[in-house]
Swiss-Prot record:
Disulfide bonds join C1-C14, C2-C10, C6-C13. The keyword Phosphoprotein does not apply. The cysteine framework is III (CC-C-C-CC). The lineage of its organism: Eukaryota, Metazoa, Spiralia, Lophotrochozoa, Mollusca. Does not show any effect on voltage-gated sodium and potassium channels (10 uM of toxin tested), and on nicotinic acetylcholine receptors (5 uM of toxin tested). Does not show antibacterial activity on both Gram-negative and Gram-positive bacteria. Intraperitoneal injection into fish provokes paralysis. Coiled coil: none annotated. This is Conotoxin Asi3a.
Length: 15
């Protein structure tokens, strides 16, 4: 998954 929490306009984490 992606970074969570998001920072610098990244996409939210997948569920």
């Amino acid at each position: 998954c992606c970074q969570w929490p998001c920072s610098h306009g990244c996409i939210p984490c997948c569920y």
